[in-house]
Amino acid sequence: MEFSVESLETPALTKAHLAELLFEQIGLNKRESKDMIDAFFDLISDSLVDGNDVKISGFGNFQIRTKAPRPGRNPRTGEAIPIQARRVVTFHASHKLKDQIQGDSAADIAE
């Protein structure tokens, strides 16, 4: 099943637009569509907060990485400021997604 995002005013795909696509393409009502999208992203967020990786086959992996504390500097004053340790989310695209993106780019370049 193919979904079109060409009707978007901006090139970003939003949660609201995903819910609209579920409504239009699959036939869920608008409330169910919104609830399903919200639940999907809540599951991903909760899993990451708990320290678990999220692996979506054919799309990519979301991982939590702990960054060590390091010295920083205020760019205006030059004052040294310590940057505390923190956890960050990283995303690594799957080979399949990378290939799809490269395939589209190669076709655009060839035209």
Curated annotation (Swiss-Prot):
Alphabetically sorted, this entry's keywords are: DNA recombination, DNA-binding, Transcription, Transcription regulation, Translation regulation
Q: Which domain of life is it from?
A: Bacteria
Checking InterPro entries in the record gives:
Hist_DNA-bd, Histone-like_DNA-bd_CS, IHF-like_DNA-bd_dom_sf, IHF_alpha
> A GO BP term, please?
DNA recombination
Query: Transferase: is it a keyword of this entry?
Result: no
Indicate yes or no for the key word Transcription regulation.
yes
SMART domains hit by this protein: BHL
Q: Which residues form the signal peptide?
A: none
- MF terms (GO), sorted A to Z: DNA binding; structural constituent of chromatin
A GO cellular component entry from the record: cytosol
Explain the purpose of this protein.
This protein is one of the two subunits of integration host factor, a specific DNA-binding protein that functions in genetic recombination as well as in transcriptional and translational control.
Question: Which proteins does it associate with, and in what oligomeric form?
Answer: Heterodimer of an alpha and a beta chain.
User: What family is it from?
Assistant: Belongs to the bacterial histone-like protein family.
NCBIfam families recorded for this chain?
himA, PRK00285.1
HAMAP family on file: IHF_alpha
Q: What is this protein called?
A: Integration host factor subunit alpha
State the species of origin.
Answer: Polaromonas sp. (strain JS666 / ATCC BAA-500)
Classification of source organism: Bacteria, Pseudomonadati, Pseudomonadota, Betaproteobacteria, Burkholderiales
